[in-house]
Amino acid sequence: MTSNRKNENEIINALSIPTVSNPSTQMNLSPDARIEDSLCVAEVNNIDPFVSASTVQTGINIAGRILGVLGVPFAGQLASFYSFLVGELWPSGRDPWEIFLEHVEQLIRQQVTENTRNTAIARLEGLGRGYRSYQQALETWLDNRNDARSRSIILERYVALELDITTAIPLFRIRNEEVPLLMVYAQAANLHLLLLRDASLFGSEWGMASSDVNQYYQEQIRYTEEYSNHCVQWYNTGLNNLRGTNAESWLRYNQFRRDLTLGVLDLVALFPSYDTRTYPINTSAQLTREIYTDPIGRTNAPSGFASTNWFNNNAPSFSAIEAAIFRPPHLLDFPEQLTIYSASSRWSSTQHMNYWVGHRLNFRPIGGTLNTSTQGLTNNTSINPVTLQFTSRDVYRTESNAGTNILFTTPVNGVPWARFNFINPQNIYERGATTYSQPYQGVGIQLFDSETELPPETTERPNYESYSHRLSHIGLIIGNTLRAPVYSWTHRSADRTNTIGPNRITQIPLVKALNLHSGVTVVGGPGFTGGDILRRTNTGTFGDIRLNINVPLSQRYRVRIRYASTTDLQFFTRINGTTVNIGNFSRTMNRGDNLEYRSFRTAGFSTPFNFLNAQSTFTLGAQSFSNQEVYIDRVEFVPAEVTFEAEYDLERAQKAVNALFTSTNPRRLKTDVTDYHIDQVSNMVACLSDEFCLDEKRELFEKVKYAKRLSDERNLLQDPNFTFISGQLSFASIDGQSNFPSINELSEHGWWGSANVTIQEGNDVFKENYVTLPGTFNECYPNYLYQKIGESELKAYTRYQLRGYIENSQDLEIYLIRYNAKHEAINVPGTESIWSISAESTIGKCTEPNRCAPHYEWNPDLDCSCRDGEKCAHHSHHSTLDIDVGCTDLHENLGVWLIFKIKTQDGHARLGNLEYLEEKPLLGEALRRVKRTEKKWRDKREKLHLETKRVYTEAKESVDALFVDSQYDRLQANSNIGMIHAADKLVHSIREAYLSELPVIRGVNADIFEELEGHILTAFSLYDARNAVKNGDFNNGLTCWNVKGHVDVQQSHHRFDLVVPEWKAEVSQAVRVCPGCGYILRVTAYKEGYGEGCVTIHEIEENTDELNFKNRVEEEIYPPDTGTCKYYTENQGTRTCGNECGSRNEGYDNAYEINAKSSLEYRPTYEEETYTDVRRENHCEYARGYINYSPVPAGYVTKELEYFPETDTVWIEIGETEGKFIVDSVELLLMEE
């Protein structure tokens, strides 16, 4: 790699073999320090083609710069950072995005499709233009934040760019191509999260609404998890796919692990620190993971000499190399002393090599005890061992020669020379290099410079200042004729001293502890933590961290912990052995679950403390659990004066919770505190930060739960949370023909409602279940919900209040009914103007509502001056309605009915948190008023009782007259349809059978009404059974009738009449009969105009009889009509009638499904005077109660004849000579003996 970095130690001829007499001499190398080797040809840049230094350089540079701008950076820092970022990812030269893609393709030997490549590169080019435009606008605005135009431009460009990158991300995770696209995806995801952070930093200043700022923040949190999981998943997939069996496959495997750690996982580890609400000031993060540069062994052998490459020289297997090189999870440590042992490979005096065959490495955790590891041959002292000192030194660069010697025909691979460039980070003037050097005259040499694989973060400063990694450990690959050292490295951000600096949040991974206590293990990190983590399964201490306090000791701090746990537990902390914090922390995952991003939570203690010594020991432990799993990623030290949004949230929540209770009694709920308000306070508490105030949150939750229990206790409603709605029957089922006993006294228990009323799970507005009432297409069939408060729940002379929360409504009617009806019609506009009748809940099985996001509530506090019976244009979402109760009587059990009703097509309502509670005792004028109301009601009830007695007697006599006896199982022979209708009308004149406000609710006279109505239903059924003519009352239109010409069926209330408007029309039906039996043909009809109406019965051409109808008025005024009825026997069909000819009941059930074409209007025989009580008249009584309905309208005549058929089939034919013939019913009744 050609580099222009300013390196004072740069070696001009890096491949020469040093001939320094003292192999451990520290060398102050300069450009003049040149040592030549005439035997070997240097091949400096001949690295494997799939190793792209440019890719690694960009990844390291970006991660390094991000580490400097975590939290809330200064404006100047951020402007400079974005300028750097745009320059790195969209420079003037070759596109780095293409390099990212090609590099991973070469590592895994899989190429993306041409379409994927072209689409991704083109989209990234567009994003580059957008970012450059945004960066320029940001710099302009930062120079003058008060300039309105600059503010408008930056906001416009921000919104456009954020949307663009949001839609672009999916293009970088194409199915089956996720791994080669991974580095592109990670860099793009990083750009998106940094951009989302800007909304939190500047959104308010740009003029964003707080809800918009919060929305961007919530997206940042959501995408952080999504992007992290994707990167870790496909990193692991790609790495596992490269797992092989031989040394060459391990080399590629390790390169993937190293380069994608630098380009992907390092970024992922920093994503959580972009959260400005958790990190509102500058934040120092640390990466403790280890990566491994390539083994120091020849890889560039010329053609024909491939066996001299180390991985072809009888190298160990993949698994053997991995076991020798990859360190098990461990505490972070630093090397202090390296002793290298050598051996000799000699073919002749001109071809020989002394080389590295083993080593002993001393290393130490921060503040911990010294540890030693040995690898290879360490007992050969024939060649003096070389000892190199690294204490307090960062080895930021290694240069190593891979040599090769030929012994007979067997190549020997070894390292005869290595130089370790170092600097003391605590004293920058202490820098230099220490060298291992042995004689070498082999057949080839290859230089390995660690900066080729781990370049500095910038080329603008010397590498001893800008280095990105430091040497942490050394492994050794051992074969029969192979020794290949492998250097491992940690990121420079993981400092040696655990220093807590001023004015910043300091993150310290717990693997930087000086020791591990009994029961603690270090486990491999899940990929997004930036290093290994600690685990305990039982109570005890994790470890001790030696801290260097670089701030005044008066500075106070709070501690936070990033952890994962399968159980609730307590964490405790100690400083120099003194306990400073103990707190409860909640479970974050289930036992057996994999460690995922969401498994970890950052939570802390609210009590601040200060350090007593500049050198202090911090201890973290856990207790109150056993046989569970607790993982610790890091601890964070936060200056106590740092104000978090979480603090404001806690303060607001505390005030809100305390405001639920009275000032004199903190265990008594305020009267004006609604159930809905308690739920909202509960949401407020639930949204508090676990990281900041877990203990306070739990305490507040207990108080809110207690308030909720008090609210439930005072609420007289049954099932206020809408777990079930009983008896959801449609109005058709309570028609005059229904089975009324299906609605009985059980209606006093819980909620009852119509079929279209639905229970919905909680949403962003309601914490618990709520109900929706849609519109209806017929106001006589409303959608409704009701409940009765029993008399036993009420106190005498007390005012009660119904209240609840209405999310939105239109034409919602609310009733409270006792002596009379208190009524209110309510319109409450919501966030949507209207919602579909069939709208379903947006809450899915896997999706929970976000109640922590701020919601814009439409007109939440609109006052309404409406009074009873008036209709408001707009109401408050908080609805209340009062009712006064006088004397109570458990035997009478009057109670209070609560009714919610929608009777318009455009009507709708969403409501919940309903309460019915005692408001106050009645005194003074209120008491006198309720007594007057109660007396009036009792007087009217007495009058109703007397009236009911009279009406019931008349109705019962009329009903009884229809039947042969009191068994009510046989009709009188002369009982016809008109008589049944007449009796039914009398039955329906019984008032107070059902509430006029909602006729599904039984009234005081329901029992006697249902008794008589049951007999009426029996009469209709018996009538249908004895009439041989199918559909003789035309309730089912013309079903079962044969028709020629034009005829109509007209409807008047519940009556259906056949209208024959012209002489050429014909209506007929074939009827099955019993030969030899006698029948009565009975017809009720009306004739308009001239001519005759004829109903004929016959068998083929013989045995014919007829009934003739004339207009009575015409008979008196006009000359007699000479026309006679004709027999319509020709061409009559023999259409059969089966089950399609329904009963009269079926006709009534479908009454409103027939659009009869009425051409005749007539006055009823008599008018009924309708009764109006203290409640308003319910005009829907027409649909079910026969008000103003005439069983036999004026002008209709009933005629009959006897007929004795001789065959099993007769024909009944209807026709006329002229004018209009109207037939109400046709009956063919079997004579009784």
UniProtKB/Swiss-Prot annotation:
The keyword Chaperone does not apply. Gene3D superfamilies: Galactose-binding domain-like, Pesticidal crystal protein, central domain, Pesticidal crystal protein, N-terminal domain. GO terms for biological process: sporulation resulting in formation of a cellular spore; symbiont-mediated killing of host cell. Transmembrane segments: none annotated. CDD domains: delta_endotoxin_C (cd04085). One of its GO terms (molecular function) is signaling receptor binding. Pfam families: Cry1Ac_D5, Cry1Ac_dom-VII, Endotoxin_C, Endotoxin_M, Endotoxin_N. InterPro entries: Cry1Ac-like_dom-VII, Cry_V, Galactose-bd-like_sf, Pest_crys, Pest_crys_dom-III, Pest_crys_dom_I, Pest_crys_N_sf, Pest_cryst_cen_dom_sf. PANTHER family: ENDOTOXIN_N DOMAIN-CONTAINING PROTEIN-RELATED, PESTICIDAL CRYSTAL PROTEIN N-TERMINAL DOMAIN-CONTAINING PROTEIN. Promotes colloidosmotic lysis by binding to the midgut epithelial cells of insects. Toxic segment of the protein is located in the N-terminus. Belongs to the delta endotoxin family. This is Pesticidal crystal protein Cry1Bc. It comes from Bacillus thuringiensis subsp. morrisoni. The gene is cry1Bc.
